Amino acid sequence: MNLLVVGSGGREHAISKKLLESNNVEKVYCAPGNDGMRLDDIQLVAISETDKVGLIDFAKKADVSFVIVGPEVPLLEGVVDAFEEAGIKAFGPKANAALIEGSKDFAKQFMEKYAIPTAASRTFTDYAEAKAYLDERGVPIVIKADGLAAGKGVTVALEMEEAVLALKDMMLEEKFGDASLKVVIEDFLAGEEFSLMAFVNGEEVYPMAIAQDHKRAYEGDKGPNTGGMGAYSPVPHISEDVVNEAVEKILRPAAKGMVQEDRYFRGILYAGLILTTEGPKVIEFNARFGDPETQVVLPRLESDFAALIAALLNNEKPEVRFKKEGITLGVVLASAGYPEHYEKGNKLTGLNDIREDVAIYHAGTKQNENGEFVSSGGRVLLLAKEAETMSDARTLLYPEMQKLDNPNFFYRMDIGTKAE
Protein backbone atom coordinates (compact mmCIF):
# COMPACT_ATOMS: atom_id res chain seq x y z
CA MET A 1 0.00 0.00 0.00
CA ASN A 2 0.96 3.65 -0.44
CA LEU A 3 0.92 5.98 2.57
CA LEU A 4 1.14 9.74 3.05
CA VAL A 5 2.76 11.54 5.99
CA VAL A 6 2.02 15.25 6.44
CA GLY A 7 4.83 17.42 7.86
CA SER A 8 8.48 18.22 7.27
CA GLY A 9 10.50 17.66 10.45
CA GLY A 10 12.60 15.02 12.16
CA ARG A 11 9.43 13.51 13.63
CA GLU A 12 7.95 12.99 10.16
CA HIS A 13 11.26 11.55 8.94
CA ALA A 14 11.11 8.99 11.79
CA ILE A 15 7.43 8.18 11.13
CA SER A 16 8.02 7.72 7.39
CA LYS A 17 11.14 5.61 7.89
CA LYS A 18 9.32 3.33 10.34
CA LEU A 19 6.36 2.91 7.96
CA LEU A 20 8.75 1.77 5.21
CA GLU A 21 9.85 -1.13 7.46
CA SER A 22 6.29 -2.54 7.35
CA ASN A 23 5.73 -5.64 5.23
CA ASN A 24 3.03 -4.44 2.88
CA VAL A 25 4.06 -0.81 2.43
CA GLU A 26 5.23 0.02 -1.07
CA LYS A 27 5.69 3.80 -1.02
CA VAL A 28 5.69 6.45 1.68
CA TYR A 29 5.09 10.02 0.52
CA CYS A 30 5.81 13.01 2.74
CA ALA A 31 4.23 16.43 2.17
CA PRO A 32 6.19 18.64 2.07
CA GLY A 33 8.98 16.61 3.74
CA ASN A 34 12.62 17.67 3.62
CA ASP A 35 15.49 16.83 1.27
CA GLY A 36 17.21 14.57 3.80
CA MET A 37 14.27 12.15 3.74
CA ARG A 38 15.13 11.19 0.16
CA LEU A 39 18.18 9.35 1.49
CA ASP A 40 15.76 6.89 3.13
CA ASP A 41 13.64 6.36 -0.03
CA ILE A 42 10.83 8.61 1.19
CA GLN A 43 9.05 10.32 -1.72
CA LEU A 44 8.70 14.09 -1.30
CA VAL A 45 5.53 15.90 -2.36
CA ALA A 46 5.72 19.68 -2.78
CA ILE A 47 2.44 20.46 -1.02
CA SER A 48 2.15 22.59 2.13
CA GLU A 49 1.03 20.78 5.29
CA THR A 50 -2.10 22.99 5.52
CA ASP A 51 -3.11 22.90 1.83
CA LYS A 52 -6.21 20.75 2.30
CA VAL A 53 -7.29 20.74 -1.36
CA GLY A 54 -3.78 19.91 -2.59
CA LEU A 55 -3.29 17.14 -0.04
CA ILE A 56 -6.66 15.50 -0.74
CA ASP A 57 -6.07 15.73 -4.48
CA PHE A 58 -2.67 14.06 -4.17
CA ALA A 59 -3.90 11.33 -1.78
CA LYS A 60 -6.55 10.34 -4.33
CA LYS A 61 -4.15 10.39 -7.29
CA ALA A 62 -1.49 8.37 -5.46
CA ASP A 63 -4.05 5.82 -4.22
CA VAL A 64 -3.03 6.41 -0.60
CA SER A 65 -4.44 3.86 1.88
CA PHE A 66 -4.19 6.24 4.84
CA VAL A 67 -2.55 9.46 5.98
CA ILE A 68 -0.68 10.32 9.19
CA VAL A 69 -0.70 14.02 10.10
CA GLY A 70 2.43 14.87 12.10
CA PRO A 71 2.49 18.51 13.29
CA GLU A 72 0.08 20.40 15.51
CA VAL A 73 -0.69 23.28 13.10
CA PRO A 74 -2.41 21.17 10.39
CA LEU A 75 -4.23 19.18 13.09
CA LEU A 76 -5.68 22.37 14.60
CA GLU A 77 -6.50 23.72 11.15
CA GLY A 78 -8.70 20.68 10.51
CA VAL A 79 -6.62 18.77 7.96
CA VAL A 80 -7.81 15.42 9.41
CA ASP A 81 -11.43 16.66 9.26
CA ALA A 82 -10.91 17.55 5.57
CA PHE A 83 -9.40 14.15 4.70
CA GLU A 84 -12.25 12.32 6.43
CA GLU A 85 -14.89 14.43 4.69
CA ALA A 86 -13.22 13.46 1.40
CA GLY A 87 -13.44 9.77 2.33
CA ILE A 88 -9.70 9.36 3.01
CA LYS A 89 -8.61 7.65 6.23
CA ALA A 90 -6.39 9.94 8.32
CA PHE A 91 -4.67 9.22 11.63
CA GLY A 92 -4.65 12.17 14.00
CA PRO A 93 -7.30 14.00 16.04
CA LYS A 94 -9.85 16.27 14.42
CA ALA A 95 -9.51 20.00 15.14
CA ASN A 96 -11.95 19.99 18.08
CA ALA A 97 -9.96 17.21 19.81
CA ALA A 98 -6.55 18.74 18.98
CA LEU A 99 -7.63 21.70 21.14
CA ILE A 100 -6.17 19.79 24.10
CA GLU A 101 -2.84 21.03 22.69
CA GLY A 102 -4.09 24.17 20.95
CA SER A 103 -5.27 25.89 24.14
CA LYS A 104 -3.48 25.61 27.48
CA ASP A 105 -6.55 27.17 29.11
CA PHE A 106 -8.86 24.53 27.61
CA ALA A 107 -6.47 21.76 28.73
CA LYS A 108 -6.37 23.14 32.29
CA GLN A 109 -10.16 23.41 32.56
CA PHE A 110 -10.49 19.90 31.09
CA MET A 111 -8.03 18.45 33.63
CA GLU A 112 -9.83 20.14 36.50
CA LYS A 113 -13.20 18.80 35.33
CA TYR A 114 -11.94 15.20 35.02
CA ALA A 115 -9.70 15.27 38.14
CA ILE A 116 -6.49 14.74 36.19
CA PRO A 117 -3.51 15.70 38.39
CA THR A 118 -1.78 18.93 37.32
CA ALA A 119 -0.41 22.15 38.85
CA ALA A 120 -2.83 24.76 40.26
CA SER A 121 -3.26 27.60 37.75
CA ARG A 122 -5.22 30.64 36.63
CA THR A 123 -5.83 32.12 33.21
CA PHE A 124 -5.66 35.84 32.40
CA THR A 125 -6.46 38.16 29.51
CA ASP A 126 -5.67 41.37 31.44
CA TYR A 127 -2.02 42.25 32.16
CA ALA A 128 -2.70 44.16 35.41
CA GLU A 129 -4.69 41.24 36.86
CA ALA A 130 -2.02 38.76 35.79
CA LYS A 131 0.73 40.90 37.32
CA ALA A 132 -1.21 41.17 40.62
CA TYR A 133 -1.59 37.37 40.72
CA LEU A 134 2.12 36.99 40.00
CA ASP A 135 3.00 39.30 42.89
CA GLU A 136 0.70 37.30 45.17
CA ARG A 137 2.08 33.86 44.18
CA GLY A 138 5.78 34.76 44.00
CA VAL A 139 8.47 32.67 42.35
CA PRO A 140 9.29 30.05 41.16
CA ILE A 141 6.32 30.22 38.80
CA VAL A 142 5.43 29.06 35.28
CA ILE A 143 3.98 31.36 32.60
CA LYS A 144 2.46 29.86 29.45
CA ALA A 145 1.06 31.36 26.27
CA ASP A 146 -2.42 29.88 25.78
CA GLY A 147 -1.95 29.02 22.10
CA LEU A 148 0.68 27.38 19.90
CA ALA A 149 4.21 28.78 20.11
CA ALA A 150 6.35 25.96 18.65
CA GLY A 151 7.36 24.73 22.11
CA LYS A 152 8.78 28.12 23.06
CA GLY A 153 5.74 29.70 24.75
CA VAL A 154 6.60 28.56 28.28
CA THR A 155 8.76 30.41 30.80
CA VAL A 156 9.80 28.71 34.03
CA ALA A 157 10.71 31.80 36.06
CA LEU A 158 12.96 31.42 39.09
CA GLU A 159 13.30 35.21 39.57
CA MET A 160 10.46 37.76 39.70
CA GLU A 161 12.22 39.93 37.11
CA GLU A 162 12.16 37.03 34.62
CA ALA A 163 8.48 36.34 35.36
CA VAL A 164 7.44 39.97 34.80
CA LEU A 165 9.47 40.17 31.59
CA ALA A 166 7.82 36.99 30.25
CA LEU A 167 4.38 38.34 31.12
CA LYS A 168 5.10 41.68 29.42
CA ASP A 169 6.52 39.95 26.33
CA MET A 170 3.44 37.78 26.00
CA MET A 171 0.62 40.13 26.95
CA LEU A 172 1.90 43.61 26.06
CA GLU A 173 4.46 42.96 23.32
CA GLU A 174 2.38 40.09 21.84
CA LYS A 175 5.57 38.05 21.38
CA PHE A 176 3.58 35.05 20.18
CA GLY A 177 0.83 37.03 18.44
CA ASP A 178 -2.70 35.87 19.20
CA ALA A 179 -1.29 32.80 21.00
CA SER A 180 -0.28 34.91 24.02
CA LEU A 181 -3.25 37.28 24.32
CA LYS A 182 -4.45 34.79 26.93
CA VAL A 183 -1.88 33.56 29.46
CA VAL A 184 -1.92 30.68 31.95
CA ILE A 185 0.05 31.18 35.18
CA GLU A 186 0.64 27.96 37.07
CA ASP A 187 2.48 26.78 40.16
CA PHE A 188 5.99 25.45 39.65
CA LEU A 189 6.28 21.68 40.14
CA ALA A 190 9.55 20.08 41.23
CA GLY A 191 10.49 16.59 40.09
CA GLU A 192 11.71 14.40 37.26
CA GLU A 193 10.09 15.04 33.87
CA PHE A 194 9.22 12.37 31.30
CA SER A 195 7.12 12.00 28.16
CA LEU A 196 4.41 9.36 27.83
CA MET A 197 2.82 8.96 24.41
CA ALA A 198 -0.05 6.62 23.59
CA PHE A 199 -1.98 5.43 20.57
CA VAL A 200 -5.57 6.44 21.34
CA ASN A 201 -8.87 5.54 19.71
CA GLY A 202 -11.79 6.91 21.70
CA GLU A 203 -11.54 5.30 25.14
CA GLU A 204 -8.93 2.76 24.01
CA VAL A 205 -5.38 3.67 25.13
CA TYR A 206 -2.22 1.83 24.06
CA PRO A 207 0.83 3.37 25.78
CA MET A 208 4.28 3.57 24.20
CA ALA A 209 7.67 3.27 25.85
CA ILE A 210 8.40 6.43 27.84
CA ALA A 211 11.08 8.96 26.90
CA GLN A 212 12.85 11.89 28.49
CA ASP A 213 13.15 15.10 26.48
CA HIS A 214 15.62 17.94 27.14
CA LYS A 215 13.77 21.22 26.62
CA ARG A 216 16.37 23.80 27.65
CA ALA A 217 18.86 25.03 25.05
CA TYR A 218 22.05 24.56 27.05
CA GLU A 219 23.85 22.02 29.23
CA GLY A 220 22.69 21.60 32.81
CA ASP A 221 19.11 22.43 31.74
CA LYS A 222 19.95 26.12 31.40
CA GLY A 223 18.83 28.71 28.89
CA PRO A 224 15.51 29.25 27.11
CA ASN A 225 12.97 26.54 26.32
CA THR A 226 13.23 24.99 22.86
CA GLY A 227 11.28 22.40 20.89
CA GLY A 228 13.67 19.84 22.43
CA MET A 229 17.46 19.34 22.22
CA GLY A 230 17.61 15.57 22.59
CA ALA A 231 15.85 12.57 24.12
CA TYR A 232 16.23 8.96 25.12
CA SER A 233 13.97 5.96 25.68
CA PRO A 234 13.24 4.18 27.96
CA VAL A 235 13.87 6.16 31.17
CA PRO A 236 15.49 3.79 33.69
CA HIS A 237 14.93 6.02 36.73
CA ILE A 238 11.13 6.17 36.20
CA SER A 239 9.61 2.90 37.46
CA GLU A 240 7.00 0.78 35.72
CA ASP A 241 4.64 1.44 38.64
CA VAL A 242 4.86 5.19 38.01
CA VAL A 243 4.15 4.68 34.30
CA ASN A 244 1.15 2.46 35.10
CA GLU A 245 -0.16 5.09 37.51
CA ALA A 246 0.18 7.74 34.79
CA VAL A 247 -1.72 5.57 32.31
CA GLU A 248 -4.55 4.86 34.77
CA LYS A 249 -4.86 8.31 36.39
CA ILE A 250 -3.97 10.53 33.44
CA LEU A 251 -4.18 8.97 29.96
CA ARG A 252 -7.29 6.82 30.38
CA PRO A 253 -9.35 9.55 32.13
CA ALA A 254 -8.21 12.03 29.45
CA ALA A 255 -9.25 9.76 26.57
CA LYS A 256 -12.59 9.02 28.27
CA GLY A 257 -13.13 12.71 29.07
CA MET A 258 -12.57 13.72 25.46
CA VAL A 259 -15.25 11.26 24.34
CA GLN A 260 -17.64 12.67 26.97
CA GLU A 261 -16.88 16.22 25.75
CA ASP A 262 -17.85 15.11 22.23
CA ARG A 263 -14.23 15.53 21.15
CA TYR A 264 -13.52 11.91 20.15
CA PHE A 265 -9.74 11.55 20.04
CA ARG A 266 -8.12 9.23 17.53
CA GLY A 267 -4.39 9.75 17.19
CA ILE A 268 -1.41 10.21 19.46
CA LEU A 269 -2.02 11.65 22.90
CA TYR A 270 1.23 12.92 24.36
CA ALA A 271 1.46 13.65 28.07
CA GLY A 272 4.40 15.73 29.25
CA LEU A 273 4.60 14.59 32.87
CA ILE A 274 6.52 15.33 36.05
CA LEU A 275 6.99 12.88 38.90
CA THR A 276 6.25 14.84 42.08
CA THR A 277 6.15 13.64 45.69
CA GLU A 278 2.37 13.24 45.12
CA GLY A 279 2.84 11.08 42.02
CA PRO A 280 2.88 11.94 38.30
CA LYS A 281 1.23 15.22 37.21
CA VAL A 282 0.59 16.76 33.80
CA ILE A 283 2.76 19.64 32.59
CA GLU A 284 1.20 19.66 29.12
CA PHE A 285 -0.81 17.62 26.65
CA ASN A 286 0.05 17.43 22.97
CA ALA A 287 -2.19 15.97 20.29
CA ARG A 288 0.58 14.34 18.25
CA PHE A 289 3.91 12.51 18.32
CA GLY A 290 6.56 14.43 20.28
CA ASP A 291 9.64 15.81 18.58
CA PRO A 292 12.40 14.68 19.35
CA GLU A 293 10.85 11.80 21.40
CA THR A 294 9.46 10.07 18.29
CA GLN A 295 12.98 9.69 16.89
CA VAL A 296 13.99 7.56 19.90
CA VAL A 297 10.67 5.83 20.69
CA LEU A 298 9.51 4.63 17.25
CA PRO A 299 12.75 2.75 16.45
CA ARG A 300 11.99 0.70 19.59
CA LEU A 301 8.57 -0.42 18.27
CA GLU A 302 8.70 -4.13 17.40
CA SER A 303 5.15 -4.38 16.02
CA ASP A 304 4.37 -3.59 12.38
CA PHE A 305 3.78 0.19 12.50
CA ALA A 306 1.59 0.47 9.40
CA ALA A 307 -0.56 -2.48 10.54
CA LEU A 308 -0.90 -0.86 13.98
CA ILE A 309 -2.19 2.44 12.53
CA ALA A 310 -4.46 0.61 10.07
CA ALA A 311 -5.99 -1.37 12.96
CA LEU A 312 -6.76 1.82 14.91
CA LEU A 313 -8.33 3.42 11.82
CA ASN A 314 -10.50 0.31 11.37
CA ASN A 315 -11.52 0.28 15.07
CA GLU A 316 -9.64 -2.97 15.61
CA LYS A 317 -7.28 -3.87 18.46
CA PRO A 318 -3.69 -3.18 17.39
CA GLU A 319 -0.59 -5.10 18.39
CA VAL A 320 1.67 -2.70 20.30
CA ARG A 321 5.00 -4.16 21.40
CA PHE A 322 8.21 -2.32 22.29
CA LYS A 323 11.76 -3.58 22.83
CA LYS A 324 12.47 -4.27 26.48
CA GLU A 325 16.27 -4.39 26.18
CA GLY A 326 18.72 -1.58 25.58
CA ILE A 327 18.27 2.17 25.24
CA THR A 328 17.99 4.61 22.32
CA LEU A 329 19.64 8.02 22.56
CA GLY A 330 19.04 10.98 20.26
CA VAL A 331 20.91 14.31 20.16
CA VAL A 332 19.78 17.38 18.20
CA LEU A 333 22.12 19.54 16.14
CA ALA A 334 20.73 23.10 16.18
CA SER A 335 21.60 26.37 14.45
CA ALA A 336 23.72 28.76 16.54
CA GLY A 337 21.39 31.26 18.22
CA TYR A 338 18.38 28.89 18.34
CA PRO A 339 15.70 29.28 19.78
CA GLU A 340 16.10 33.04 19.29
CA HIS A 341 17.67 34.52 16.16
CA TYR A 342 19.63 32.15 13.90
CA GLU A 343 20.93 32.07 10.34
CA LYS A 344 19.79 29.71 7.61
CA GLY A 345 21.80 28.41 4.67
CA ASN A 346 24.87 27.27 6.61
CA LYS A 347 26.62 24.29 5.07
CA LEU A 348 26.62 20.98 6.97
CA THR A 349 29.94 19.17 6.99
CA GLY A 350 30.74 15.62 8.04
CA LEU A 351 27.37 14.03 7.21
CA ASN A 352 28.93 11.45 4.90
CA ASP A 353 31.29 10.33 7.68
CA ILE A 354 28.55 9.27 10.12
CA ARG A 355 28.62 5.54 10.99
CA GLU A 356 26.04 3.42 9.21
CA ASP A 357 24.55 2.15 12.49
CA VAL A 358 23.69 5.72 13.57
CA ALA A 359 20.31 6.98 12.34
CA ILE A 360 20.15 10.49 10.86
CA TYR A 361 16.77 12.23 11.09
CA HIS A 362 16.70 15.42 9.05
CA ALA A 363 14.58 18.36 10.22
CA GLY A 364 15.74 21.85 9.17
CA THR A 365 17.89 20.87 6.19
CA LYS A 366 17.73 21.29 2.42
CA GLN A 367 20.06 20.66 -0.49
CA ASN A 368 21.58 23.60 -2.38
CA GLU A 369 22.16 23.69 -6.15
CA ASN A 370 25.38 21.67 -5.67
CA GLY A 371 23.53 18.94 -3.77
CA GLU A 372 25.14 19.94 -0.46
CA PHE A 373 23.03 19.96 2.70
CA VAL A 374 22.52 23.39 4.28
CA SER A 375 20.49 24.47 7.30
CA SER A 376 16.92 25.70 6.82
CA GLY A 377 15.65 25.80 10.42
CA GLY A 378 16.48 26.06 14.11
CA ARG A 379 16.68 22.35 14.82
CA VAL A 380 18.71 20.98 11.93
CA LEU A 381 18.84 17.21 12.47
CA LEU A 382 19.06 14.50 15.11
CA LEU A 383 21.47 11.59 15.37
CA ALA A 384 20.17 8.47 17.17
CA LYS A 385 21.94 5.36 18.41
CA GLU A 386 20.68 2.24 20.11
CA ALA A 387 22.96 0.48 22.59
CA GLU A 388 22.81 -1.90 25.55
CA THR A 389 23.44 0.85 28.12
CA MET A 390 23.31 4.64 28.20
CA SER A 391 27.09 4.76 28.74
CA ASP A 392 27.57 2.74 25.56
CA ALA A 393 25.09 4.91 23.65
CA ARG A 394 26.81 8.14 24.71
CA THR A 395 30.28 6.72 23.99
CA LEU A 396 29.17 5.72 20.49
CA LEU A 397 27.00 8.73 19.61
CA TYR A 398 28.97 11.77 20.74
CA PRO A 399 32.03 11.08 18.50
CA GLU A 400 29.53 11.09 15.60
CA MET A 401 28.13 14.46 16.76
CA GLN A 402 31.70 15.80 16.81
CA LYS A 403 32.03 14.99 13.11
CA LEU A 404 29.36 17.68 12.54
CA ASP A 405 31.23 20.28 14.67
CA ASN A 406 30.99 23.68 13.06
CA PRO A 407 30.73 27.21 14.59
CA ASN A 408 27.34 27.67 12.89
CA PHE A 409 25.76 24.85 14.93
CA PHE A 410 25.62 23.59 18.51
CA TYR A 411 24.40 20.60 20.51
CA ARG A 412 24.13 19.65 24.17
CA MET A 413 26.87 17.40 25.52
CA ASP A 414 24.81 16.14 28.50
CA ILE A 415 21.88 14.34 26.87
CA GLY A 416 21.35 11.05 28.71
CA THR A 417 23.72 11.66 31.64
CA LYS A 418 20.84 11.24 34.12
CA ALA A 419 20.32 7.69 32.87
CA GLU A 420 23.96 6.55 33.07
UniProtKB/Swiss-Prot annotation:
Coiled-coil parts of chain: none
Free-text remark on how the cofactor is bound: Binds 1 Mg(2+) or Mn(2+) ion per subunit.
Residues noted as binding ATP in the record, renumbered to the chain: 134-195
PROSITE patterns: ATP_GRASP, GARS
Disulfide pattern: none
Family of this protein: Belongs to the GARS family.
Name of this chain's protein: Phosphoribosylamine--glycine ligase
Species lineage: Bacteria, Bacillati, Bacillota, Bacilli, Bacillales
